[in-house]
Each structure stands twice: as structure tokens, then as C-alpha cells.
From Swiss-Prot:
It catalyses: 2-deoxy-D-ribose 5-phosphate = D-glyceraldehyde 3-phosphate + acetaldehyde. Pathway: Carbohydrate degradation; 2-deoxy-D-ribose 1-phosphate degradation; D-glyceraldehyde 3-phosphate and acetaldehyde from 2-deoxy-alpha-D-ribose 1-phosphate: step 2/2. One of its GO terms (biological process) is carbohydrate catabolic process. This is Deoxyribose-phosphate aldolase. Catalyzes a reversible aldol reaction between acetaldehyde and D-glyceraldehyde 3-phosphate to generate 2-deoxy-D-ribose 5-phosphate. Keywords: Cytoplasm, Lyase, Schiff base. The gene is deoC. It is found in: Cytoplasm. The lineage of its organism: Bacteria, Pseudomonadati, Planctomycetota, Planctomycetia, Pirellulales. GO terms for cellular component: cytoplasm. The active site is at D95, K159, K188. It comes from Rhodopirellula baltica (strain DSM 10527 / NCIMB 13988 / SH1).
Length: 241
């Protein structure tokens, strides 16, 4: 007997549609799949966000996109402009990459100011922000300091990875991030969560969201375990997460 309800897991998933090779047809079918499986959000290439938001209107699935993606090296001004454009285009949740170079350099004032400026404009518009650390490049001391900064700035989520670095979410990182983030900050796993068992494991560690491209496989298995009918829909490839 499963110890979860369907929406406990479906509403964890941010369905990832970020690979640069996805065509318009791929993106549209991916959005349709996300709606059918009742996920939390679709995280889509920024240029397609306006169409995505229109398709998602009234479905209960949120539109999200990326800022400073995937390496975080954009200037603060560019990241703010990206965020403003995304919000104008209907974005409800922004996945923002920190300046990894500044984190590794110990430029904490720069890092805090940048996160703060983008968080402020996001919250002023009534939307939410997820701050991506890209943990595969960081030491624990960096991750802990980022959690402290994000707690102070009242960001909505701290997120492990872009899914495009040298590694994705690890159980140790999720424990660390949950331990060092305030109660007001949620944790998102990204990269490497490709089956239902792993999704349930990250949920048990306190992650409330998970970036995923294997949505149909994971939620198809959940529906099977819960005795729910299968969803007959296919979407063309979205690899990366």
C-alpha cells in the first residue's frame, strides 16, 4: 500500500523543457504532458514562456523559466532584465543561477546583493524564486553560506543544480540544504532524479520540488502503485534532468 497520494508526488515535479534542441512541437507536447499529469510547473526555454503560460492558464500548472542559466555568469543587470521579461511573459516561478565564480572567489557581498535584487523584483511582482547553487562545483562551506544568505533574503526555494553541470542532486546535499535553510525556505532537487523510488527518497529528505524530464515514467509508476488509470499521452524527448 503506497504511503502517499498522487498529488503528493505530482505536485513535486517541475517538468523540464530546457534542452536547446527541443522544437516547438516538442515544447508543445511537453506542456500537454505536464498538464495531463498535473505537475507543479513547466520549466521552459525563456523564448517560449509566453506561449507556455497561455497554454497553462487555468490548468493549475504554473509557468516557470530560468534566469542566468546555466552558468550564472551574466551580469546582475542582465539577470534582472531576464527576470522582468519573464514576469511580463507570464512566469510565476523563476529558477535563478547564482554567480558561481563569485561564490568560489568568496565574493559574498556580490552574491548576496545579486540574489537580493532579483528576489526583490520577483516578490514585488507577486511571483516566486528558486536559487540554483550548482552544488557539483562547490564545497559544503559554500553551500551552507548560500543557504544562510537565501534564508536571510527570504527566497522561496534553494535548488541543488541546473541539471547541466557535472553532477546533479545528491542525498547528502539535500540533507545539508534542508539543515541549513530556514523554515521559510523550501528545497528543490534537480539532476539525477529519474525514477519514482528516488523521487520518494528526496521527498523524505525534505525536498518539496524536483526538476525532472522523466515525468511520465515517474508519475506513470505512481499511478500504477495507487491503482489509478494510466494516462495515454506521449511527448518527444526532453533530456537533461
Amino acid at each position: 500500500m503506497a504511503d502517499y497520494q498522487y498529488h503528493d508526488v505530482s505536485k513535486m515535479i517541475d517538468h523540464s523543457l530546457l534542452p536547446p534542441t527541443l522544437t516547438e512541437a516538442d515544447l508543445d507536447s511537453g506542456i500537454d504532458l505536464a498538464i495531463a499529469y498535473e505537475v507543479a510547473s513547466v520549466c521552459i526555454l525563456p523564448y517560449y514562456l509566453k506561449r507556455c503560460a497561455a497554454k497553462l492558464a487555468g490548468t493549475g500548472v504554473k509557468a516557470s523559466t530560468t534566469i542566468g542559466f546555466p552558468h550564472g555568469g551574466h551580469t546582475t543587470a542582465i539577470k534582472k532584465a531576464e527576470a522582468e521579461q519573464a514576469i511580463q511573459d507570464g512566469c510565476e516561478e523563476l529558477d535563478f543561477v547564482v554567480n558561481i565564480s563569485q561564490v568560489l572567489s568568496g565574493g559574498w557581498d556580490y552574491v548576496q546583493n545579486e540574489i537580493g535584487e532579483v528576489t526583490e523584483l520577483t516578490h514585488a511582482a507577486g511571483q516566486k524564486i528558486k536559487v540554483i547553487f550548482e552544488n557539483c562545483y562547490l564545497q559544503d562551506e559554500h553551500k551552507i553560506r548560500l543557504c544562510e544568505i537565501c534564508t536571510e533574503l527570504k527566497v522561496d526555494w534553494v535548488k541543488t543544480s541546473t541539471g547541466y553541470g557535472t553532477g546533479g542532486a545528491t542525498m547528502d546535499d539535500l540533507r545539508l540544504m534542508r539543515q541549513h535553510s530556514g523554515e521559510n525556505v523550501q528545497v528543490k532537487a534537480a539532476g539525477g532524479v529519474r525514477d519514482l523510488a528516488t523521487l520518494l527518497e528526496v521527498r523524505a529528505l525534505g525536498a518539496s520540488r524536483c526538476g525532472a524530464s522523466r515525468t511520465a515514467e515517474m508519475l506513470g509508476e505512481a499511478r500504477k502503485q495507487l491503482g489509478m488509470p494510466a494516462i495515454e499521452i506521449t511527448a518527444t524527448g526532453s533530456s537533461g534532468y
